[in-house]
């Protein structure tokens, strides 16, 4: 086994710092992508929800302000978490293939 590849060896402090910085960068990219998706989803769900309450008699009678807010916020939260999760996983997957192995040094 090449030096540095043994699972019994303790990782160096520099290696841990590098992994921590990578994790922070991945999560930051996920937060930004999730926030962008949440804004788009809130607008995309608010417009038809509010329009239907004004134009459809059934929606006017059955969807109060709380129901409207719940519809919009559910779509927003779902978009945020789905996109953030996919972005973090994609970034980690992409960068895991780019890491040089210790045996090549």
Swiss-Prot record:
GO terms for biological process: nodulation. PANTHER family: EARLY NODULIN-93. It is a single-pass membrane protein. It comes from Glycine max. Keywords: Membrane, Nodulation, Transmembrane, Transmembrane helix. The lineage of its organism: Eukaryota, Viridiplantae, Streptophyta, Embryophyta, Tracheophyta. GO terms for cellular component: membrane. This is Early nodulin-93. It is found in: Membrane. Pfam families: ENOD93. The chain crosses the membrane at residues 66-83. It comes from the Eukaryota.
